[in-house]
Amino acid sequence: MADMQNLVERLERAVGRLEAVSHTSDMHCGYGDSPSKGAVPYVQAFDSLLANPVAEYLKMSKEIGGDVQKHAEMVHTGLKLERALLVTASQCQQPAGNKLSDLLAPISEQIQEVITFREKNRGSKFFNHLSAVSESIQALGWVALAAKPGPFVKEMNDAAMFYTNRVLKEYRDVDKKHVDWVRAYLSIWTELQAYIKEFHTTGLAWSKTGPVAKELSGLPSGPSVGSGPPPPPPGPPPPPVPTSSGSDDSASRSALFAQINQGESITHALKHVSDDMKTHKNPALKAQSGPVRSGPKPFSAPKPQTSPSPKPATKKEPALLELEGKKWRVENQENVSNLVIDDTELKQVAYIYKCVNTTLQIKGKINSITVDNCKKLGLVFDDVVGIVEIINSRDVKVQVMGKVPTISINKTDGCHAYLSKNSLDCEIVSAKSSEMNVLIPTEGGDFNEFPVPEQFKTLWNGQKLVTTVTEIAG
């Protein structure tokens, strides 16, 4: 029931966005959402993209259903908002600074909503689908790039393929719908690249003759752009802080201003000071006086006392070690040194997430292992028939006792991979990572440590780029 309520709320927000888009007046140069008829060619071309690969992606997502369908609706909303921005750009000149940021804000917020949905549904059986979308949805941000938006979209498409390959591997021989889903989704970004190359090679093409685009009056600002009236105007400034002395202070202030208003005549009330009353001309008077007091210090605004505000207590997620379908979930474990998974099967996978200072042993033969967002994790396993992936982690140590064909290290700082004699042919694939070492067993039972290269040199040989490892003598 709660899931249904969440879906209804998300759909209401999406409808609110699109209604606000469609009601924005062209006179304000806000987001337009007029039909393609009469639109400039690049808006018509974008409509063709929406009607073909996007429509196919939505269709396949609906057939799969569940989280995939919900996620697709969010993506569709983002594309609709982008289409509206294209209409605006075709009619208006580009605004500067913060005004441009205001126009881009709804798209940015929708991108964040897509990413957040994946983070909130890490236990979903369609997690690879959600990850493919989440890792690439930032491609919608090409409209904010001043140069080379096409390569940026390609980079996001490549990020999606990291996860779509997993989807294909899991469903290729099981359910063709998922294969078609991958094809439809990736085609959105490949066609968007071609679209950008044709119409927006050096950035979003704005009108040269229309009025300057203004801040959106039809879309309220906030963490989530939704339906509803704009926020009320700010209230009146707070009244001045009353002083503690009450009517006496008021009377004394009145008297002070009355004296000031006298102008030059105020000096008539001053008394004449004779020489015998001046300390610099009467040494006896100077000796009688005490130490000279310094005058009042210049006024400085009092510094507010900065008392450390208590930080809101971060909600600690429950620790998990459970089998969900064919997936072993090991999550949020901290300072545990004796975790063991021994009841394994060949078709099972293990997903290890947000574990800190923890040691886990996986016995038997398993399909694949993923280590995500872990710190100071020790992982020991027997055999993996697929791949061991380490993503977004720090200080991870992995030891294979049997055999593993591939170890993938991505966005990780600090990884030690201890290989067994049966896994010396293991492939180590790394990207955006540092401090990686592979340890090879010796005859005496020890290990020899070999660092994985992190620095490369690329040269053009006249026909292609040639990349070699750069060795730094130390």
Curated annotation (Swiss-Prot):
The modification Phosphotyrosine is found at Y31. GO terms for cellular component: cortical actin cytoskeleton; cytoplasm; glutamatergic synapse; plasma membrane; postsynapse; presynapse. It is a peripheral membrane protein. Signal peptide: none annotated. GO terms for biological process: actin cytoskeleton organization; actin filament organization; ameboidal-type cell migration; cAMP-mediated signaling; cell morphogenesis; modification of postsynaptic actin cytoskeleton; receptor-mediated endocytosis. There is a cross-link at K347 (Glycyl lysine isopeptide (Lys-Gly) (interchain with G-Cter in SUMO1)). It comes from the Eukaryota. The modification N6-acetyllysine is found at K80. It is found in: Cell membrane. Keywords: Acetylation, Actin-binding, Cell membrane, Isopeptide bond, Membrane, Methylation, Phosphoprotein, Ubl conjugation. The modification N6-methyllysine is found at K286. Residues 215-252, 277-316 are annotated as: Disordered. In all cell and tissue types examined. Residues 216-227, 243-252 have a biased composition (Low complexity). One of its GO terms (molecular function) is actin binding. The modification Phosphothreonine is found at T306. Residues 312-452 form the C-CAP/cofactor C-like domain. The modification N-acetylalanine is found at A2. Residues 228-242, 299-311 have a biased composition (Pro residues). The modification Phosphoserine is found at S34, S289, S294, S300, S307, S309. Homodimer. Binds actin monomers. Directly regulates filament dynamics and has been implicated in a number of complex developmental and morphological processes, including mRNA localization and the establishment of cell polarity. Belongs to the CAP family. PANTHER family: ADENYLYL CYCLASE-ASSOCIATED PROTEIN (PTHR10652), ADENYLYL CYCLASE-ASSOCIATED PROTEIN 1 (PTHR10652:SF1). This is Adenylyl cyclase-associated protein 1. It comes from Rattus norvegicus (Rat). The gene is Cap1.
